[in-house]
Amino acid sequence: MRADLVSPSSAHLSYAIRDIVKFGELVRQHGLDITWENIGDPVAKGEPIEPWIRQIYHDVVDRDESWGYCPTEGFREAQEALAAHVNERPGARISPADIIFFNGVADAVAKVYGFLSPHARIIGPSPAYSTHSSAESAHCALPHITYDLDPNNGWLPDLEDLRHKIQTYPSIAGILIINPNNPTGAVYPVEVLEKIVALAREFGLFLIADEIYIHMVYPGVETAHLSEVALDVPAIVMRGISKELPWPGSRCGWIEVLNRSLDQNFSAYVDSLIAAKRLEVCSTSGPQLAVPRVFGDSRYAVHLSRRAQMFAARAEEAYKALSSVRGIKVHKAQGAFYMTVLFEPGALNGKNQLPIASPGLRDVVERQCKGAAPDWCFVYRLLGSRGICVVPLTGFYTPHPGFRFTLLETDDAKRAWIFRTLAEALAEYLITGEVAA
């Protein structure tokens, strides 16, 4: 071509959650059934949709307006309903105009980072969720700036590290919070959120909160919506229905803009997001019309409570199966539907192995491991040996080796097998390293 077509930003795009699928498919071609524990799709794992939620969408499809375009920011009735839900809580007040719909939270992420000045940086947590870290890196063609989540403190934010990074990098304009956290399953106490808000206030930053899992906090765990604690700091909260209905195929998400009037530059930035959305005309219309009816139904609170209890029980199952394995650290999830296993220092030494019956598949796996990070090698060998697909933790923009798995399997016996097999494979892998050493 007469000109280079490839953006330098493309080098910063990675998504380990899907990247591992390509290798999993290669393993499957060698005759091994694959159990996919890499992606957070409850529907794909067999969770049934509540009949009353299905009926609401059936009714929506019968409305002519669900087949056409909607206003760029979203249907007014959906905006009004969501703004009312925010205003039912103590804290920041918003208007319907502060709700802007996108085609899923991922679309919101792309716009929020894509229309920032390339000189304005957003610091995010590490481990990071790949959609955020890649989008932030790509918008400026630079490595993502992160603050540590402490594995020795329940994966909570290291606030001293956050303060240090803010002071070190004057280009930082905003702080990203993911609560409940993906990939760790941690949920941030109110006082932690308040301290992050205080840092934003002190340094003149805005906040981004990914709250896609905020209605999936387990019983007995206390947290808050950002709108409840960010009373005087401009912020963008990202929400959606992919996880909590669940309806990931709807691609229906939105942002809540908090305290827009406090800063003229922030307000102009929000205007640019709307202008960018206007170029696409609008977001998917049908699911928007379902949101007010689902969220306003008296059965919805029961639905959310049931699912939170269900995932809390599964987290307990996983913790019991894995916590006794030597050489790893496991934090029991407090929200969302993921858990993370962390390898302790020295546990991975290049000598670890898992048996793979097929010589051909073993060769494929070992070729894949050449030059790969140690936790990626474990994931490849786990796939070849046991047929379970998980995501390497270093794929989440962190130096900590480990892996993430889901709590989504609906078949009780199979879920028990998954957790038991993970524990057995880990024990075997780490023991072979000790013997070889």
Q: Where are the regions that the model predicts?
A:
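PLP-dependent class I/II
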Residues: 1-73, 77, 83-437
